[in-house]
């Protein structure tokens, strides 16, 4: 059942990275934030 907890952790990590991606996208469309963010190109 280690595999089951690995699956849960992977799902949590996917959700966390989705949230980061949404936050970065929102920041990059907002000029005062985009200017400060190295993640916006």
From Swiss-Prot:
Tissue expression from the record: Expressed by the venom duct.
Location of the protein in the cell: Secreted
Keywords associated with the record: Disulfide bond, Ion channel impairing toxin, Neurotoxin, Secreted, Toxin
Keyword Disulfide bond attached: yes
UniProt xrefs under InterPro entries: Conotoxin_a-typ
Taxonomic superkingdom: Eukaryota
Broad class of the protein's primary localization: secreted
Residue stretches in coiled coil: none
Assigned GO CC terms: extracellular region
Pfam families: Toxin_8 (PF07365)
Cysteines paired by S-S bonds: 27-33, 28-40
Protein name per Swiss-Prot or TrEMBL: Conotoxin Bu22
Lineage, opening ranks: Eukaryota, Metazoa, Spiralia, Lophotrochozoa, Mollusca
């Amino acid at each position: 059942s280690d595999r089951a907890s690995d699956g849960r952790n992977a799902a949590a990590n996917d959700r966390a990275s989705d949230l980061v991606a949404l936050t970065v996208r929102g920041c990059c469309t907002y000029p005062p934030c985009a200017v400060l963010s190295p993640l916006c190109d």
